């Protein structure tokens, strides 16, 4: 009986070891892959009616491919290629870069939006996933007109 009591009695060293293992397991669970990584690049300032090129680079850390739709939204209406929407298959080994050329004569806030969508005929064999947690990602920049 005494041997059984020793076996079930937790020493401080054992408790410390279990605590460290638990903390390590929780930290490892925080290392999740990013669904969308985006880099939106526009000039900070331009002169009125100068051509502006907006560049959006998109990649993922997921192992599965996704169908994405990218587009721009502005605080004031802009014409031309600004309104183009791009649809593409995004995979971890194949990042995408999108370009928009437009003109403006007013200071404007611009949001680059990436939606993960369900659409057939974009990814090979229609093999694509849709994240449960988030399916819309965006970033905003301000374009100053001097």
Swiss-Prot record:
It holds the Pfam family SVA. SUPFAM superfamilies: E set domains. One of its GO terms (cellular component) is extracellular space. Glycans are attached at residue 105. Gene3D superfamilies: Immunoglobulins (2.60.40.10). It is found in: Secreted. The modification Pyrrolidone carboxylic acid is found at residue 29. Residues 1-28 form the signal peptide. Keywords: Disulfide bond, Glycoprotein, Pyrrolidone carboxylic acid, Secreted, Signal. GO terms for molecular function: aspartic-type endopeptidase activity. Belongs to the PIP family. Monomer. Interacts with AZGP1. This is Prolactin-inducible protein homolog.
């Amino acid at each position: 009986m005494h041997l059984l009591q020793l076996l079930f009695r937790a020493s401080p060293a054992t408790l410390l070891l279990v605590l460290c293992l638990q903390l390590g397991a929780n930290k490892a669970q925080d290392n999740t892959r990013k669904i969308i990584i985006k880099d939106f690049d526009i000039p900070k300032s331009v002169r009125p009616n100068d051509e502006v090129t907006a560049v959006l680079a998109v990649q993922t850390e997921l192992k599965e491919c996704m169908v994405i739709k990218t587009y721009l939204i502005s605080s004031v209406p802009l014409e031309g290629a600004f309104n183009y929407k791009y649809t593409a298959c995004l995979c971890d080994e194949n990042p995408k870069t999108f370009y928009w050329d437009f003109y403006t004569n007013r200071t404007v806030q611009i949001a680059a939006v990436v939606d993960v969508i369900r659409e057939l005929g974009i990814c090979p064999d229609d093999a694509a996933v849709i994240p449960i947690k988030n399916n819309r990602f965006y970033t905003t920049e301000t374009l100053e007109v001097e």
